[in-house]
Amino acid sequence: MASVMEDPTLERHFKGHKDVISCADFNPNNKQLATGSCDKSLMIWNLAPKARAFRFVGHTDVITGVNFAPSGSLVASSSRDQTVRLWTPSIKGESTVFKAHTASVRSVHFSRDGQRLVTASDDKSVKVWGVERKKFLYSLNRHTNWVRCARFSPDGRLIASCGDDRTVRLWDTSSHQCINIFTDYGGSATFVDFNSSGTCIASSGADNTIKIWDIRTNKLIQHYKVHNAGVNCFSFHPSGNYLISGSSDSTIKILDLLEGRLIYTLHGHKGPVLTVTFSRDGDLFASGGADSQVLMWKTNFDSLNYRELLSKHSKRVTPDPPPHLMDIYPRSHHRHHPQNGTVEINPVADTQSTDPQVVEVGRVVFSTTDARNYDGASSSRAQFTSGMDSGPFRTHTQAREEEDENQEERFAGGMTASPAERSGIPSSLTSTLENIVQQLDILTQTVAVLEERLTLTEDKLRTCLDNQVLLMQQNQQLDRSDEESEGPPL
């Protein structure tokens, strides 16, 4: 294996979403990539050659976040529809859904043990949930504006969050208290995450910067301003030595954190880059953005360097309190600006290989453990863009006809017909029921608001009546005093 770093290369591109790509995450087994989009669908891309991709439908608004459970058997998605869904990333397409917030849910993230979820929302709160029962555990409520992102530390003892109040906050999951606040932004803090060792957190901002803080000393140790527009996302390499970032300037940057410098600028997207993520082994990373395409890159980093680190990290037992692993250098909090020595890569699009065939699946299993979290909305079928009758893009009817013709061959190996076919429920009825449930939810919220207003009105009326009684009593006392002072008539 080569000991000299090679340039990153574009391995594959995936097309199947019909709108902006907003989020992405690799399965820990390194065999799947999940992406969420403004087209309200979740896509599971199987990375094996010629493998089919799955499109999951169920959310009723933009998908904002996606994260695989450590086991790889579940994938969570968050949405502007105020819900979180837990999907089985297979042809079965089953999902459970619960209402998580009273406004858009911006991000979702599993703890390392897979037992908890943390969500961030435009309702200014961060919430933690039990995964098994979809049960609300506790809320963190110190942000004063929309919360854009929340992440567990590698050991699960801390949560980092950031938002439009221009702060990055650190929370203790035991005491549920905010233990530190980092405020050094000229705009919204857009993304936050821990490095693999848990010693540092990084945050990106609308002010074009990426900042790395040592949470043991509470000091800013690195400050990068290498983009020409706001930084929307970033991802730490598993070794902790590198960081990739995506920006509204349409570029992806790769930073060498040990040397504290920009080493690569990658071009490939047309429009803002909204999501980047490394695979768990660090060999691949994916990017997505406003051009509705997903690009998968091979890192080609010096494997001899970081594989040794990964093996040491995986063997470590940590009885000592975190953070416990390598520090990030340099310690000085100087700025890093674009350098002339960096390499710019303009990959050539692969026009020979076809995009994977997309199978539409989606079956909702509602959470019944907590009625307050029920957001009844059954999945509806999304149609492919019409007019594309050849190549990897097919209409829903054409895909269904082809699937019927090759059913035995295609569903060999344990795969079965789609859930809609098994249930026999017409899509029109499903859509109607979904609309009814949404309207009922709106009516419930409206009634709750009216009840609150009625209660306030009653309280104010009661106060007015009490004040009126007091005034009458005072007037009566004044009248008696006047009569007594005047004395009896002559």
Curated annotation (Swiss-Prot):
Coiled coil (UniProt feature): 431-463
UniProt GO cellular component terms: centriole; ciliary basal body; cytoplasm; extracellular region
Domain of life: Eukaryota
SUPFAM superfamilies associated with the record: WD40 repeat-like
Spans annotated as Disordered: 375-427
UniProt feature, compositional bias: Polar residues: 375-388
CDD domains: WD40
PROSITE patterns found in the cross-reference section: WD_REPEATS_1, WD_REPEATS_2, WD_REPEATS_REGION
Repeat (WD) residue spans along the chain: 16-55, 58-97, 100-139, 142-181, 184-223, 226-265, 268-307
Entry's family note: Belongs to the WD repeat POC1 family.
Name listed for the protein in its UniProt record: POC1 centriolar protein homolog B
Gene name tied to this protein: poc1b
